[in-house]
Amino acid sequence: LNAVKIKGITFVYNLTTNAILLPKYMNYLVENDVHLLISIDGSKQNNIYRVKKEGKESFDIVFANIKKLKDNHPNYFDSNVNFNSVLHDKNSVDQIYSYIKTNFDKTPYISELNRNGIAEDKKEEFNRMFHSKEDSIKQAVNCGSSYLKEIADDSHIVQLDIFMQSYFGNTYKTI
């Protein structure tokens, strides 16, 4: 990162991570003001699909690494760390908001499972796992979630996203 310095231009670096290797690179990321987007789908029960390469669950390691970053670098954590969660059959919009807001005082980005490129023999499994963000938001509203303001704000973003994708052929979609 230090090699890319041009007078008059400020570079901002963004990194998406599952936080498994966070302790190894933590000081470097903080020193270089790298913005982090940490992938976590909620509580340990919600995070069931995020496993390490050998198939073991990763939640306890991820949670400990995030807490370590927050405890050791609170200002960096407040300004540079955000969360992305993927909605599926083991979580809900309300559960995700509740968990991340309670534990990290952050409002997460929430994405649906990507519908593109599903192998024909995996479609049934995908359909079982897929949960609509719009339906999950409605469920949170109907249940009187304590995070209605955040969820409603996110709902407006979802509506804008649908509009943009419907009316403009070339859109760039991220989290």
List each language-model region with its residue ranges:
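Canonical radical SAM enzyme core domain
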Residues: 1-31, 35-36, 40-46, 53-61, ...
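Radical SAM enzyme [4Fe-4S]-AdoMet core and its adjacent flexible, acidic
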Residues: 48-175
